[in-house]
Structure formats: C-alpha cells, structure tokens
Amino acid sequence: YSGLRNPAVQNGFGHTPCVGILSGYFNKLRRKNRISIDQAVAGMLGNETRFRSLVFQAGENLDFSQIAWDKHGLPVHQIDSPRKIFNLLFQVNENEQTQQQILAEDRSILDAVFRQAKSMEKRLNATDRAKIDEYLTSVREVEQTVKRRAYWSDRSKPQVAYDLEGFDRKSVDDYVGALLDLAVLALQTDSTRAVTVQIPFW
C-alpha cells in the first residue's frame, strides 16, 4: 500500500490533521488529489441510488471536523440533524411534488450556459480554453445532478418502521445512536451505498 502515511499527524497539530483521515491529505490550501475514500467509493457505487453518498456529522461543525472531500478537493455537505436525515430519506416533502417544473427550468438554463460557453471557446487562447474546459466540466457535473434529481423525483421513497419520537439531541446516546440507525437504514433501503458518519468529540 502507498499514500497512507500522513506525516502531519506527527507535528503536534492536535485534532487538525483529522481533515485528512479519509484522504491521507492534510494541506487545506491545495486541493489536487484530495478526494476522500468514501467519495471514491461513491463514485464507483453511487450511480444507481437516490443519493450518491451521505455524510452525517454528530455535534458541532468545526473546521477540522470535515473529513469527506470530493474530487475537486471541496468539502462534501454534512448533515447533523437526525430529523432532517429521516425526512430526506423517507418523508415526502410537498415541495418535491412540484419539482419537475423546476428541474425542467434548470435543464434549460444549463443547456443555454453550455451552448454559450462552447461558442466562446473558439475565440479563446489556449489558457482561456483550459479554464473554459474546467468550467464546462463543472456544468456537466451539475447537469448530471439535475438529471439524477429528475429521475428520482417521481419515485416513491421507501417506508420504514422507525421513528424519532422521544428523541433527545442533548443525549449523546440518543444522538449518535440515531445517526448510526439512519446510516444502517439508508444502506438497507439502498437509498445510498456510501455513508460516512463523523463523530468528532464531546
């Protein structure tokens, strides 16, 4: 194995090197090759599920509590509320029922942006073309996200025999236990195939 050694943890930075626990990468100023292993797994297994990946965070969202990084080296959104997670996975939001029109509008906007960028590309020098290529790559990724949302927007969410009645966020056992329960349910219902649960400290 290679790339698993992280010398930064030997330099007395306390909890700060935790940002690289899933990526083996500590320098927050450089983003190249900083994808975390959970997101690499999501890239391979997450194309057939409602959620490509899910990242749960227990407790306060501190600078060094971010451990999931996308292929651009950017932090992946973390959810810290069990109720929000439950609703995301299993509850139908009334707003979701009207999202087909919104998604169609999003696709139209992306098509227009893509056409405009491609028309500009021919008039640019090599450096600017490289930047446009990066921009178009980002546009394509957003387009894939929109298509994914459109595909799942008219498909029913799974039903589970689980509720959060009596849940007390102030109880460490309740809080962490609920996050772990929801992680298991997300996998059991095949809502995702990549779940990361971050439990910093209390």
Put a short name on every predicted segment:
Residues 1-202:
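Ligand-binding pockets and gating/stacking loops
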